[in-house]
Amino acid sequence: MIRIGMVVAEFNYDITMMMLERARSYAEFLGVEVHKILRVPGSFDMPLAIKKLLMDNDIDGVVTIGAVIKGETDHHKIIMDNVSRKITDLSLEYNKPVALGISGPGESRLQAEARIDMAKEAVESCVKMIKLLKSN
């Protein structure tokens, strides 16, 4: 059985918790076990939690869940640039997929709400990559 971990940002909690529920339901639909869920303050805080999950031999891959909504400055771009880069680095370092389920940057709250299903897409991406890596 495939076992995944999830890292969820609490910032924009109303959106990320809906994303988490969709992701968990979809993982169950796919027959995938969600082994651990770690909650972090915001998307910028994810890399350390991702690393902790990747170090666990019982976890095949990690799904990230967050919503980076545009504010009055370019802070949202800095967050996404750094988090996405570090997520890729960790995936390559541990040879396990880390799926980007963080919506943004540059989106409004309304757009973030419309993109809640992005969490399901991240689960699907993670599972596909796990299967690919296990088959070769």
UniProtKB/Swiss-Prot annotation:
Origin superkingdom: Archaea
EC number(s) per entry: 2.5.1.78
Protein name (Swiss-Prot/TrEMBL): 6,7-dimethyl-8-ribityllumazine synthase
Residues annotated to bind 5-amino-6-(D-ribitylamino)uracil: 11, 43-45, 67-69, 100
Annotated PANTHER family: 6,7-DIMETHYL-8-RIBITYLLUMAZINE SYNTHASE, 6,7-DIMETHYL-8-RIBITYLLUMAZINE SYNTHASE DMRL SYNTHASE LUMAZINE SYNTHASE
Entry GO CC: riboflavin synthase complex
Keyword Cytoplasm: no
Single GO MF annotation: 6,7-dimethyl-8-ribityllumazine synthase activity
Family: Belongs to the DMRL synthase family.
Keyword Hydrolase part of the UniProt annotation: no
Catalytic class of the enzyme: transferase
Positions of (2S)-2-hydroxy-3-oxobutyl phosphate binding: 72-73, 115
Annotated pathway: Cofactor biosynthesis; riboflavin biosynthesis; riboflavin from 2-hydroxy-3-oxobutyl phosphate and 5-amino-6-(D-ribitylamino)uracil: step 1/2
Reactions accelerated catalytically: (2S)-2-hydroxy-3-oxobutyl phosphate + 5-amino-6-(D-ribitylamino)uracil = 6,7-dimethyl-8-(1-D-ribityl)lumazine + phosphate + 2 H2O + H(+)
Lineage: Archaea, Methanobacteriati, Thermoplasmatota, Thermoplasmata, Thermoplasmatales
Any Pfam family: DMRL_synthase
Function: Catalyzes the formation of 6,7-dimethyl-8-ribityllumazine by condensation of 5-amino-6-(D-ribitylamino)uracil with 3,4-dihydroxy-2-butanone 4-phosphate. This is the penultimate step in the biosynthesis of riboflavin.
Keywords attached to this entry: Riboflavin biosynthesis, Transferase
An example Gene Ontology biological process: riboflavin biosynthetic process
Residues the record marks as active site: 75
